[in-house]
Amino acid sequence: MRPSKRAADAMRDVTLERAVARYAEGSCLVTFGNTRVLCTASLEERGPPWLRGSGKGWVTAEYAMLPRATHERTRREVNSGKPSGRTQEIQRLIGRSLRAVTNLPALGERQITVDCDVIQADGGTRTASITGAWVALHDCFAWMRARSIISVDPLKDHVAAVSCGIYKGQPVLDLDYAEDSAAETDANFVVTGKGGIVEVQGTAEMEPFTDEQFLELLRLAKGGVAGLVELQRKAIA
């Protein structure tokens, strides 16, 4: 049995609260159970230097954890001089996921930076970040359209993400920290609203997993993301 007593295919309670940051063009507070992430989308009227003259915009992301988001205080990475390898990996993943569903030429030569700040971590911070970041980005684009900065919505589709794993021999959906820390296999799936796969990250922590187990994890993930996309649709309605 899972520590949370959830069924194998059951997500934690998920909420998406919009317009939580007064000054950001778009914002969302996302919760996956006890994991809470503040996502803010900020418009910059200048794109990255390497895109100047291309007529194309850019969407990027930054990720950070507050010092007491974890059980014990974690030092701020700024004090070490640079982001950790884990932080860089996660923020690149968030950026790739958002760009996969964004029509970049529709932005013009502008950049949107989505900041994902983990307030409380209980597993799945990167998947919660991607899911909430999409809502913040959506609202940023709506803000831009309302002010005639852009004429069309650059978003091509929804995107959301969920973790899956093998816990005590059973494939399960949306691992919390208790499961994640003891899982035999841990995987993250980023999937669009139409079911396209953006990225899969999977690691066997103890024993290698089989093709059949991987396909079951994929099935669980697609079901979980379908539910997350429906929550996104309701949130922006």
Curated annotation (Swiss-Prot):
**Pfam families documented for this protein:** RNase_PH, RNase_PH_C
Alphabetized Gene3D superfamilies for the sequence: GHMP Kinase, N-terminal domain
Q: Which GO terms describe its molecular function?
A: 3'-5'-RNA exonuclease activity; tRNA binding; tRNA nucleotidyltransferase activity
Name the chemical reaction catalysed here: tRNA(n+1) + phosphate = tRNA(n) + a ribonucleoside 5'-diphosphate
Q: Which keywords are on file for this protein?
A: Nucleotidyltransferase, RNA-binding, rRNA processing, Transferase, tRNA processing, tRNA-binding
For this protein, what is the EC number? 2.7.7.56
The question of whether Transferase is a record keyword is answered with: yes
Q: Which InterPro entries match?
A: ExoRNase_PH_dom1, ExoRNase_PH_dom2, ExoRNase_PH_dom2_sf, PNPase/RNase_PH_dom_sf, Ribosomal_Su5_D2-typ_SF, RNase_PH, RNase_PH_bac-type, RNase_PH_CS
Q: Where does phosphate bind?
A: R86, G124, T125, R126
Q: Which biological process terms from the Gene Ontology are attached to this UniProt entry?
A: rRNA catabolic process; rRNA processing; tRNA processing
Q: What does this protein do?
A: Phosphorolytic 3'-5' exoribonuclease that plays an important role in tRNA 3'-end maturation. Removes nucleotide residues following the 3'-CCA terminus of tRNAs; can also add nucleotides to the ends of RNA molecules by using nucleoside diphosphates as substrates, but this may not be physiologically important. Probably plays a role in initiation of 16S rRNA degradation (leading to ribosome degradation) during starvation.
Similarity annotation = Belongs to the RNase PH family.
* Subunit architecture: Homohexameric ring arranged as a trimer of dimers.
Q: In its UniProt entry, what is this protein called?
A: Ribonuclease PH
Q: Which organism is it from?
A: Methylorubrum extorquens (strain PA1)
Taxonomy, top ranks, is: Bacteria, Pseudomonadati, Pseudomonadota, Alphaproteobacteria, Hyphomicrobiales
The protein's gene is named rph
